[in-house]
A protein has these predicted regions:
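Short sequence/structural segments immediately N-terminal
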Residues: 7-541
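Bacterial N-terminal signal peptides
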Residues: 1-6
């Protein structure tokens, strides 16, 4: 069951915008001025008839003094004045996906997550995702991010999608607004947030952030900025312009780390499918003398748009794999998309990026913290090879009560759009019941493998403790740590991925089997060393 609040009707509009003379804007914002190419974007797209004043206010002061910036709307309601169906669908709440559903419970995706992932901040709270309209609110609220600084004004607001869209601070309050330091405000919390991790929650600061978050005299914020102040500056989750160019309406990506991977590093849109990468390309377009950049897609591709967030990426400090030194937010590697599937991931982290997220609290093994790698999992899957995109299942074409056909922006599981609008479009000989049955068969199978991999990881850690206590040589422990690193990545990848392996069940099974094998090989090394150590001790008696 889903629900939402309609803010705009078919004719819907907020107060009329004050129009401006677009030619005055074009005098500077052409392909030679400081806001290069804006004119070219505007005149060639379907927004050519939309006046600049629709999205930009306080323009008179800007015309008088270039250093006085106009106010640019980042609120989805601005787009909703024309795109009412898309906007209202974004506000929908999936009442069947409860908030604050912890993954690390006996009935969750991973019952022993806290044991296996100590001392990482995710052990404080690691919840299942819910409707996109809440993604900023949920980030600010999570126990691992701000030490409990930001709290709900009332639990009654937890499901108010319209209030969340209008601004996160309609729902949340700051426990200590007179300070801006990261600290614990309650027990069992962490202060792990930083500005980079918020850029897939909100791009309200897109005009105040230089490419890659590097320090820049024109940028208000960078990777090292005070994260509390940065958080307070945000209001809206998943802005429309993240995927749609506001001037030309062309499909685009705005996540700098993704543009870096595809264009700057030359890895392409589909690194495991070179021919597809040649067909679907990204053109890097720089603005304001290279201050920031966007990536224009050669054709609409919802996989690339969704991959701005539904992807594994570094967004935190870590450890340099070559030197062992601390990697701080000043290092560009703290804003990094590895753009790799699970089988190449650890190798690339060590060889290409020389980055380790943290070390296990018990074994000391190098650990890579995985974030929602839906895109990498989808690469090479049967569905991806068949031409299916994220939108086909999660944002299908719908028809409103008024008969208007539109793309749903209620990003949710196929079930809640109606299987007849998703799975049955291709599987036209199926019933909705069969689609649901098949989906759950795959998810149940993979969840079983996740739990088996988890069991063997826990056994590895427990055996490591016994071995270390008995005085097993460090040379053996060092070798076992390598197995632990591999096993952990190939387990947590699927804990972090949000389809329970449905996006690529064959890869999920192979990867999780590899995790189990790595754990078992590590255990075998330890058991052998334990037996040898016991014999050596017995000889001394």
């Amino acid at each position: 069951m889903v629900g939402g609040l309609s803010l705009f009707g078919a004719s819907g509009a907020q107060a009329a915008a004050k129009p401006v003379d677009v030619n005055t804007c074009y005098n500077c914002h052409d392909n030679t001025g400081p806001g290069s190419d804006i004119k070219a974007f505007h005149v060639r797209g379907s927004h050519a008839s939309i006046n600049c004043g629709h999205c930009h206010t306080e323009t008179e002061a800007h015309v008088r003094n270039f250093n006085v910036k106009p106010v640019t709307s980042v609120d989805q309601r601005t787009c909703g004045q024309c795109h009412a169906e898309q906007f209202n669908s974004m506000l929908q709440v999936n009442w069947d996906r409860p908030p604050k559903e912890e993954k690390a419970t006996p009935t969750g995706r991973t019952s022993r997550y806290d044991t296996l992932m100590r001392p990482h901040g995710f052990t404080k709270e690691h919840a299942e995702p819910r409707s996109h309209v809440f993604m900023l609110v949920d980030h600010l609220l999570v126990d691992r991010a701000y030490g409990g600084r930001f709290q709900l004004k009332s639990w009654e607001l937890i499901g108010d999608g319209a209030a969340a869209q209008a601004g996160a601070w309609n729902i949340l309050y700051d426990v200590e607004p007179e300070t801006n330091n990261q600290k614990a405000f309650r027990g069992q919390v962490a202060t792990a947030a930083n500005p980079v991790c918020m850029f897939c929650k909100s791009q309200d600061n897109i005009l105040n952030w230089a490419y890659m978050g590097d320090p820049h005299p024109k940028a208000k914020w960078d990777r090292t900025s005070n994260v509390v102040d940065f958080a307070r500056s945000l209001n809206h989750a998943l802005n429309c312009f993240t995927c749609h160019d506001p001037h030309s309406t062309e499909p685009r990506i705005t996540r700098d780390a993704q543009i870096q991977a595809i264009v700057d590093r030359g890895e392409g849109t589909y690194p495991y499918d070179k021919e597809k990468s040649k067909r679907i390309t990204v053109e890097k377009v720089e603005f304001r003398d290279g201050f920031r950049a966007i990536g224009l897609l050669s054709e609409p591709d919802s996989n690339m748009m969704c991959a701005q967030c539904h992807v594994e990426y570094n967004c935190n400090p870590g450890i340099d794999a070559a030197t062992g030194e601390r990697v701080t937010m000043a290092d560009q590697r703290t804003n990094l998309m590895q753009w790799s599937n699970v089988f190449d991931f650890n190798r690339r982290m060590y060889e290409d990026f020389k980055f380790i997220d943290f070390r296990n609290a018990v074994t000391g093994a190098d650990q890579m913290k995985i974030q929602h790698p839906e895109m990498e999992v989808f690469w090479g899957s049967k569905m991806e090879q068949a031409g299916v995109e994220c939108k086909d299942c999660h944002m299908p074409k719908m028809v409103s009560k008024a008969g208007v056909k539109y793309t749903s922006h209620f990003q949710t599981s196929p079930k809640y759009h109606g299987y007849e609008n998703t799975c049955l479009v291709c599987h036209d000989d199926w019933t909705p019941e069969r689609a649901d049955y098949t989906i759950h068969a795959i998810k149940n199978y993979v969840r079983g493998k996740i739990n088996k991999a988890e069991f063997w990881l826990a056994e590895l850690i427990d055996t490591f403790v016994r071995a270390k206590d008995l005085g097993v040589p460090e040379s053996v422990l060092a070798e076992v740590r390598k197995h632990h690193t591999e096993a952990n990545t190939h387990w947590e990848w699927w804990v972090a991925e949000n389809s329970d392996g449905f996006h690529n069940p064959e890869q999920a099974r192979e990867s999780l089997a590899y995790s189990m094998t790595q754990s078992q090989q590590g255990i075998a090394l330890l058991e052998k060393a334990i037996e040898e150590r016991r014999k050596a001790i017995a000889k001394l008696r």
